[in-house]
Amino acid sequence: MNLPKKVRLVEVGPRDGLQNEKQPIEVADKIRLVDDLSAAGLDYIEVGSFVSPKWVPQMAGSAEVFAGIRQRPGVTYAALAPNLKGFEAALESGVKEVAVFAAASEAFSQRNINCSIKDSLERFVPVLEAARQHQVRVRGYISCVLGCPYDGDVDPRQVAWVARELQQMGCYEVSLGDTIGVGTAGATRRLIEAVASEVPRERLAGHFHDTYGQALANIYASLLEGIAVFDSSVAGLGGCPYAKGATGNVASEDVLYLLNGLEIHTGVDMHALVDAGQRICAVLGKSNGSRAAKALLAKA
């Protein structure tokens, strides 16, 4: 069994996780979460999003969060910046890495960002050009790679095309997102094989939601395909405001438990991660969405 010896976890809880919460979240609580996550050993954290508060009110205050966090050496603190205005705001906050997002489904693209896939990619061109000028790295996301809430099945060749376009534009890595969590291990392997014909596996990442309880199976399938970067969210926070009924991202604690069992190195401390998840869940007044965290807390 030829699995990666090391995996990089991309912690998306502070951005993708919190953006769907209904109640306002204090900047101080967001700062504490990011600091807790970096202290747990996560070396890539998506801190916030520079988008219009009209569209994503929970991401208001991202500049203050960046100003307040304790930035540790060797940790990447990234932000979503889907347009030039957002990129410029991120730059003012000292952000060294940003992410842009496209979709593999035309219907999802129209409902999520109000334009076609082709138009959305064209919008990123000035962002990528500005990023090159300022030596800011750019990561690309693709939504709905294994299914769409409006279009149903998504052709892996369409995903491969979007991934190739993002890479050619200058994205150093492309994260493949199963936004509504319908993917299975077999479909995941077929998807990666298709996308890897256009983009090298070492430049791909997996982003799985657990709607049907398949996220860990899909991560394992991805590991078998040579993928060594995965997005996850502490305590399983998050969902998708544009995909009705979609549950949260796969929990970071659950992914870590899987990887620890496979003796794959991550550099993340499980107990510190569980504590970080419990603290933010207490702030939000909700139960922890991680099964591993709940099991470990029950033993404590």
Curated annotation (Swiss-Prot):
Temperature behavior of the protein's activity: Optimum temperature is 37 degrees Celsius.
UniProt pH dependence: Optimum pH is 7.
Pathways per UniProt: Metabolic intermediate metabolism; (S)-3-hydroxy-3-methylglutaryl-CoA degradation; acetoacetate from (S)-3-hydroxy-3-methylglutaryl-CoA: step 1/1
Keyword annotations: Lyase, Magnesium, Manganese, Metal-binding
Single annotated GO MF: 3-hydroxy-3-isohexenylglutaryl-CoA lyase activity
Cofactor: Mg(2+); Mn(2+)
Domain of life per record: Bacteria
Residue numbers binding substrate: 15
Pfam families on file: HMGL-like (PF00682)
InterPro entries: Aldolase_TIM, HMG_CoA_lyase_AS, HMGL, PYR_CT
Catalytic activity from the UniProt record: 3-hydroxy-3-(4-methylpent-3-en-1-yl)glutaryl-CoA = 7-methyl-3-oxooct-6-enoyl-CoA + acetate; (3S)-3-hydroxy-3-methylglutaryl-CoA = acetoacetate + acetyl-CoA
Gene deletion effect: Cells lacking this gene are unable to utilize L-leucine, isovalerate or acyclic terpenes as carbon source.
Domain named Pyruvate carboxyltransferase: residues: 7-274
Cofactor note: Divalent cations such as magnesium or manganese.
Residues at the catalytic site: 240
Residues that hold a divalent metal cation according to the record: 16, 207, 209, 249
EC number: 4.1.3.26, 4.1.3.4
Top enzyme category: lyase
Family, per entry: Belongs to the HMG-CoA lyase family.
Reported function: Involved in the L-leucine, isovalerate and acyclic monoterpene catabolism. Catalyzes the cleavage of 3-hydroxy-3-methylglutaryl-CoA (HMG-CoA) to yield acetyl-CoA and acetoacetate. It can also catalyze the cleavage of 3-hydroxy-3-isohexenylglutaryl-CoA (HIHG_CoA) to yield 7-methyl-3-oxooct-6-enoyl-CoA and acetate.
UniProt protein name: 3-hydroxy-3-isohexenylglutaryl-CoA/hydroxy-methylglutaryl-CoA lyase
Organism: Pseudomonas aeruginosa (strain ATCC 15692 / DSM 22644 / CIP 104116 / JCM 14847 / LMG 12228 / 1C / PRS 101 / PAO1)
Taxonomic lineage of the native organism: Bacteria, Pseudomonadati, Pseudomonadota, Gammaproteobacteria, Pseudomonadales
Gene: liuE
